[in-house]
Every structure is written in structure tokens, then in C-alpha cells.
Amino acid sequence: TNDFMRF
């Protein structure tokens, strides 16, 4: 999973 743009 991609947690780069997790806000």
C-alpha cells in the first residue's frame, strides 16, 4: 500500500 499521501 502507498502511504505517501496519507493525512
UniProtKB/Swiss-Prot annotation:
Compartments reported by the entry: Secreted
GO cellular component, one term: extracellular region
Keyword terms of this UniProt record: Amidation, Neuropeptide, Secreted
Domain of life according to the entry: Eukaryota
UniProt KW Iron-sulfur keyword: no
Listed GO biological process terms: neuropeptide signaling pathway
Annotated positions of the Phenylalanine amide modification: 7
Family: Belongs to the FARP (FMRFamide related peptide) family.
Name of the protein this chain belongs to: FMRFamide-13
Organism per entry: Sarcophaga bullata
